Amino acid sequence: ATQHPQVDYNGLLYSSVPYASAPSQAVNFVASHDGYTVIDKLRLSVKGDHADDELPPIDKLIHTILLTAQGVPFIRAGEEMMQDKQGEPNSFRSPDAVNRIDWALKAKNRDLFDYVRGLIALRKAHPAFRIPTAEGLQQGLHFLDTGDSGVIAYTLGEYANGDAWKEILVAY
């Protein structure tokens, strides 16, 4: 979203330049009230005999990326407990049974709920995950060469944004 010397903006489909001048101008989200929930999207894309078993770890990865990325994270209410909208892509005219938060899911999916709560606490405790300026991001965030592994990894270093930790390694 902001200028970084290690990012090649020529490969982007929507723009050849960054669209934000500061990380705080980028709102990061996977789902909102306007479409499918995260779990609905996953159910549409993850197929096979063990798909239901694969959804929670994928959901954890999604939340890990969202809450460790620079910018402002946005989490739709209920995502932290695998709330769905019964596959409804636009629930504007749907009944409360589709749109309400099913609080029983908090107990059923407690592992994910606690995991997301822990990620929020990590983000709040470490200002390196909330670098406010493009200059701070350019100085503190360094991508690692992971080749063709499919892994994205970077460090937040030198006490980025006044963090108590000298260096943080983030890898997905």
For each predicted feature, which ranges?
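Conserved, charged catalytic cores of large soluble enzymes
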Residues: 96
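Catalytic cores of secreted or luminal carbohydrate-active enzymes
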Residues: 106-137
